[in-house]
Amino acid sequence: MKKYDRGWASLETGAALLIVMLLIAWGAGIWQDYIQTKGWQTEARLVSNWTSAARSYIGKNYTTLQGSSTTTTPAVITTTMLKNTGFLSSGFTETNSEGQRLQAYVVRNAQNPELLQAMVVSSGGTPYPVKALIQMAKDITTGLGGYIQDGKTATGALRSWSVALSNYGAKSGNGHIAVLLSTDELSGAAEDTDRLYRFQVNGRPDLNKMHTAIDMGSNNLNNVGAVNAQTGNFSGNVNGVNGTFSGQVKGNSGNFDVNVTAGGDIRSNNGWLITRNSKGWLNETHGGGFYMSDGSWVRSVNNKGIYTGGQVKGGTVRADGRLYTGEYLQLERTAVAGASCSPNGLVGRDNTGAILSCQSGTWKSSSASIWTNIKTFTLYPKNTQVLGRFKLCINTYRIDGREMAETEVVPIDMPDSNGEMIWQAKNYTQYSSYFMKITCLK
């Protein structure tokens, strides 16, 4: 580059740097304005929340505030009062970012003293610039947003209204916030406490709550998702698919088209468990139970057995198969041999316990049976032998003295239907000449 062109290059570079610096300064100003605006919008939301809480408080305590205020003397509502009554959360600060404190001044309307009107005013702290006041007044969503410029008058956003602070008994200074709550606004707040809202209002669950009984005038409640109640009285039918009860279900009667399932016991104090159509009681786990399929018999489901450690009683007890007893057969009534009886085949006993049987219409004593099929065994010392099934086995060989006590012939099971048992013999004697001679009879 020629030396005489170097001055122009330096000038161009300096101009470019100057433009960049101007753009940075301009952008920084815009960014700062944006941050300030967002901060003022946040302040406006906080004021709106506070005003909404004050509005609800007035609506809830409308009658009380009427009694404590006049057209010139206000009833004053503070942040502490709103927090203590639950209209503001306990974490809500007493002052805003500039140290200003909000209060609501409630007075009676001069034209209609039965109605209330109010103004929310901030006081103390550092004043806001006019730009901030104008911005916040437009962004306040509850009531009519405004601000105070001269310390005496509250002016609405876009200068839409102007009211002297003295009309509300309020005091403040320049650079502070004001919100007007008209008589219509507060009348609506009072009605809010008595009106049941069809839709949910965020932060106002009380608007969807009944405070007294409701009479539907014999009309219906349709398309109900869930009904939660402490008690219920119905003069007609209650129809449904499923029902869950943690306590008791009481009624004069109940009809179920399908099943009833209980996790615990089913009790009847003075009634019956009644079934129909050949049904009865069934244990689902083991497949047993009782039912009736005719007018005469109570039957066991699936021919299950009946087991009890107590007694089974009846006018008669019939076994189509064998009749077994694990102990003895006890006949309580007595018969007399030679007396008449019916039918043949009855078994009884006399007063001595001897067995009688009904034969040809007469009680007869059982004749002594003749034992036959005699079999003998020889058992030498130091041996044991199972002899077989007999009615009786005896040692017929004489062994004198001590050796007699060292032999044994005994049954080792219970008698069968023929009175026969398995017999066993033992010979514990020491000498080979002391063998046993055993005779068994059938």
Swiss-Prot record:
Chain residue ranges for the region called Constant region: 1-361
InterPro entries membership: Enolase-like_N, Shufflon_N
Keywords linked to the UniProt accession: Plasmid
A Pfam family that the UniProt record links to this protein: Shufflon_N
Location of region: Variable region: 362-442
Transmembrane feature ranges: none
Stored SUPFAM superfamilies: Enolase N-terminal domain-like
Miscellaneous: This protein is expressed by a shufflon (= clustered inversion region that works as a biological switch). The orfs of this region share a constant N-terminus, while the C-terminus is variable.
Protein name per its UniProtKB record: Shufflon protein B
